[in-house]
Amino acid sequence: MPLNTNNEKLTSKNVLNDRITKRFNDRRLFIVLLRFIIPSILVSFFAALYIFVDQIMIVKFVTRSDLNPDSIFDNDYFNFVDSNGQSWIYQDYLTASNNLKIPPFNINDLIRAAISISAPITVIINALTLLITMGLANQFSKALGRGDEEKIKEVWATGFITNVIVSIATSMIIVGVAKTWLTSSANGTMNRSLESLDTNSRYGYIVSIFFSRFRELQVQNASSYVYILAGLFTIQTFNQMYFLLNQSEGRQLFISIIPPLANLINILFDYLLIRYTSAGIAAAAYATVIGWSLSCLAYVIYNIVLIKKKATHLEYREIFRKGHFNWNYLYLIILIGLASFFRNAALSVSNGIFQTNLVTITEKIQPNLPPNYYQSIFGSVTPISNLMLQSVWGLIHGSRSLCGFKFGQRNFKDITKIYWYVPLIAFSYSSIVYLLFGFGLNNIFLINLFNIQGADNLVVSNLVLRITLVQSIFIALSMNAQLLFQSTQRIGMAWIASLMQGLFTFAPVFFTMYNLAIDTNNIYLYIWIQPINAILTCIGNWIISIPFAHKYREFVSKRFDIGTMLDKYLNKTKNPKVKAKQ
């Protein structure tokens, strides 16, 4: 009887593996690639839309208006009592700033500025959802390509347990450092603005204390938003894991339906919680977590159905079975996932540096403006640019499953084709989205969704938006390098490619453009830092990846890399087990 049961299990697994292989081995490689990329773009788009909708709802509904007449967030929100017991109201600041001919800030500026400084941390949160899941999906695809049943079980068990532990630990770390990070971003060197004010005069003193009040409230609101997302993002790591692993098994339809539905629920709860509670920005974060939770529940139910149908390798009983957790696969999963994490984390840090010094350079070049003027502008621009950037990254997520499977089959010819197909698709897609967001929907977004008021502010916002969006095209063109290196387990090269934009090219570009902007008294040279950085990154990544894409075998045999070393070690340690069974 046990023999029959084992034979049935083996037969069902063989049928499942054959079914998965057929999904990947269609001769029309470009069509297969599109089949994987399009759902990934949609999922990445809707994942970014979570944050985008939150930020729109924050801008439109948090502040008091006809849409939310009962809100506590109006210009009187700035009123406070100082340490000496003196009461100050917003009208005092308005009078002082008008007398000093300094454009005053208002409640909308505060909300946008809070969004702006929280953006780098939300990017890190997105990065952490990929830290384990991307390496797990890579190894899972490779195991499926080889048809190695034992490795499939070991990768699944190791990745699941690691994802739980790492996501909880990193969540605690982010919550611990968030307040310090946000305070630094809000401050910049904003105190330098006081140098141009006579703080001994009444008007100068009033403006200075309201600048401090603005920063205090900016950090307070951004913190409440970030704490909730950072504290509960473990749920989203499971969503990412289920999506990538189901995609690795060749499924597309159901996993592409869940994110849009969750987003609709997110919008509903955004409205209800922001409109009918006084939680402000925090309400939007709660709505996002509700959307995450419902998505996770849907994925789990779907996976249970697949398990009962014997249509998936993602069986929960295999997770804690003795011998399935493999420390060597743990190292590979983390090392491969670190490339995606490094990319997003480095971009987050570089964006934080950019945002912090934006205050400084505004003070130096345009001292007649509030120090947080351009930071507030980016509070409207950043959600739009992030929406485009995140959807562009869906290209690499989709193609990586196919590329990893081909690597498991040692099909290097198809890997080279994928390397060239991806930038072709990426350029077409990113160019269309650039024109749509930069010249088609720009005013609709800026005026109707982000409350940009005044013709001058609209002109500045449009210019900043179009400059910022340029980077998306070149990021899309350069992503094939990281795709190639991660999928073929060239971990060292993957790290270099992923750190190119956030570190290697950013440092020289930042210092050059920062000083050039000050020397020429042109703040837009500073704003061009991100696009120029993306262009140089594209050039650098193509230089290091093109030779590798066409001479894979030679590079594997002649070039040392930690990924290939670990892979060879795994194969050596596994062979004795196979012989023992024989």
UniProtKB/Swiss-Prot annotation:
Transmembrane segments: 29-49, 117-137, 155-175, 225-245, 254-274, 287-307, 329-349, 376-396, 432-452, 458-478, 491-511, 523-543
Pfam families in UniProt: MatE
Listed InterPro entries: MATE_fam, MATE_MepA_subfamily
One function term, GO molecular function aspect: antiporter activity
Assigned keywords, A-Z: Cell membrane, Membrane, Transmembrane, Transmembrane helix
Localisation per UniProt entry: Cell membrane
CDD domains: MATE_like
PANTHER family: MULTIDRUG EXPORT PROTEIN MEPA, SPORULATION PROTEIN YKVU
Name under which the protein is recorded: Uncharacterized protein MG447 homolog MYCGA2290
Organism, as annotated: Mycoplasmoides gallisepticum (strain R(low / passage 15 / clone 2)) (Mycoplasma gallisepticum)
